């Protein structure tokens, strides 16, 4: 039982006190301001708050909190404070931004301790999100079933606070967090109205959500690590199975040094778990019956241990050879490539049918066209239309915007097995650009192209920086044969790219 506690305690013995006084330090808000200026995190920050940041406002906020004069004012009060001359909601934004930096300090201290060689808890084989790409290339085609899991949100905000108190012992900080959450968010749901959540730092919400996810993932990983020892057995062979596991333990102890690479035969349960944003997948070589058991493990764990309402319909079982998995912006499946081999032996000949499993990643063209249609680049059928809101810009600015979006989409979907759908997206953006320019100059598309030619659209097809690097690495013959373009290329930064993030 002591061994199991290592998995379930989440290293909670390592708690840190006295985080609350940091809310009165000016450098905390300076760090929060630096987070806001980080362009890579632009989708996590409130730009209105960043633009209004100043050291004078920080000093006034600290004085106000130190005097305990109404730490937080209701979000419905949008009037300006006559004494300070600023919107009261601005102070709430700054407090939540500063608190988002403070609660991350215990985790930063753990990283410092690890770099100094101190002992840390087991990582349970947790890996970076970038390990998804080698998993798809090396392991995905060997699996049979996958659980497509839609992670439920906590139905009560107190669950988020309870998850954080295992890491932070400072009661004052937790009281401040609880008060802020209950003051500005809907008490019935984690999904709050935009008016309420806009004055609360999104970075803090993501941190609380990830802390809560880490809580139930630790229990799931414990079950995963023990799954290889929980095989169903009949009572008739139960004693033989005990001796069998005893032999396995003996083999693991004797051959650990000499045959370490072969230990996967005994230890690897062939279960892979990946979480990305609000979704997760559980892939395995098990049968559909065992995957159905894992499905109800998830539902029961969420409902009875974490008090989150979840239905079995939120967890779907897909057979990879028949269905595609919508994950990371791709439709991934396992395709069978049939091959016929003729074998000649003396006077007899044999024909052998082989089916090789191969990973197939396709672009969800329907949903992508829907996104382009919503952004007013085409209609619902995929026919390009002009972008009237951009017609007031200069020609070079219009072309740069379209080229940027086209390259971002090409960069993101470079891991696709088939590039035909990507060429269609490029076609839509190309002619949407032409129609926008023709609209600006009050001319038809045909007359506009006839007058200027298509040379000015060469930027859509010019060699990108990544392709230029590949042309230097790979031989020119291999590069010009276009095999490189047909192959999958995974770029590690696509996990934080919104496909149309730069179209506004």
Curated annotation (Swiss-Prot):
GO CC terms of this entry: chloroplast
UniProt entry tagged with the keyword Metal-binding: no
Assigned keywords, A-Z: Chloroplast, mRNA processing, Plastid, RNA-binding, tRNA processing
Gene Ontology terms for molecular function: RNA binding
Localisation per UniProt entry: Plastid, Chloroplast
GO BP term, example: mRNA processing
Record carries keyword Plastid: yes
Pfam family for this entry, one: MatK_N
Role, per record: Usually encoded in the trnK tRNA gene intron. Probably assists in splicing its own and other chloroplast group II introns.
Family assignment from sequence similarity: Belongs to the intron maturase 2 family. MatK subfamily.
Protein name: Maturase K
Organism: Adansonia digitata (Baobab tree)
């Amino acid at each position: 039982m002591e061994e199991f506690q290592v998995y379930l305690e989440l290293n909670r013995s390592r708690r840190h006190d006295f985080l609350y006084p940091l809310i009165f330090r000016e450098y905390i808000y300076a760090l929060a301001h630096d987070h806001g200026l980080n362009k890579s995190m632009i989708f996590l920050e409130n730009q209105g708050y960043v633009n209004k940041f100043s050291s004078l406002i920080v000093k006034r906020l600290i004085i106000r909190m130190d005097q305990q004069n109404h730490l937080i004012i209701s979000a419905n009060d949008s009037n300006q404070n006559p004494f300070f001359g600023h919107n009261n909601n601005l102070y709430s934004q700054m407090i939540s931004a500063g608190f988002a930096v403070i609660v991350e300090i215990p985790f930063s201290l753990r990283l410092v301790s690890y770099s100094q060689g101190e002992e840390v808890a087991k990582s349970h084989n947790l890996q970076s999100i970038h390990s998804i790409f080698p998993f798809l290339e090396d392991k995905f085609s060997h699996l049979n079933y996958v659980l497509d899991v839609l992670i439920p949100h906590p139905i009560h905000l107190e669950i988020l606070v309870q998850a954080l108190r295992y890491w932070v012992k400072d009661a004052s900080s937790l009281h401040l967090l609880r008060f802020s959450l209950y003051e500005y968010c809907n008490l019935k749901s984690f999904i709050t109205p935009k008016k309420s959540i806009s004055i609360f730092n999104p970075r803090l919400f993501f941190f609380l959500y990830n802390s809560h996810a880490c809580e139930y993932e630790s229990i799931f990983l414990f079950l995963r690590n023990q799954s290889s020892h929980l095989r169903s057995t009949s009572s008739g062979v139960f004693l033989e199975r005990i001796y069998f596991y005893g032999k396995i333990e003996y083999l693991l102890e004797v051959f650990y040094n000499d045959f370490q690479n072969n230990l996967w035969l005994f230890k690897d349960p062939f279960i892979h778990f990946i979480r990305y944003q609000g979704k997760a997948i559980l892939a395995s070589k098990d049968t559909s019956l065992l995957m159905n058991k894992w499905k109800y493990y998830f539902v029961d764990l969420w409902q009875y241990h974490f008090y989150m309402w979840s239905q079995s319909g939120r967890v779907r079982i897909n057979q990879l050879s028949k269905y595609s998995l919508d994950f990371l912006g791709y439709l991934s499946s396992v395709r069978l490539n049939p091959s016929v081999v003729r074998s000649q032996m003396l006077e007899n000949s044999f024909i052998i049918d082989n089916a090789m499993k191969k990973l197939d990643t396709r672009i969800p063209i329907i949903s992508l066209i829907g996104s382009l249609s919503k952004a007013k680049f085409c209609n619902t059928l995929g026919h390009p239309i002009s972008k009237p809101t951009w017609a007031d810009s200069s020609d070079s600015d219009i072309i740069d915007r379209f080229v940027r979006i086209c390259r971002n989409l090409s960069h993101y979907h470079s891991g696709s097995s088939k590039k035909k759908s990507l060429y269609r997206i490029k076609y839509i953006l190309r002619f949407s650009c032409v129609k926008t320019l023709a609209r600006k100059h009050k001319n038809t598309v045909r007359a506009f192209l006839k007058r200027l030619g298509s040379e000015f659209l060469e930027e859509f097809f010019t060699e990108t920086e990544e392709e230029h690097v590949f042309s230097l690495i790979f031989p020119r013959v291999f590069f010009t044969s276009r095999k490189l373009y047909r192959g999958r290329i995974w770029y590690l930064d696509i996990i934080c790219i919104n496909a149309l993030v730069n179209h506004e």
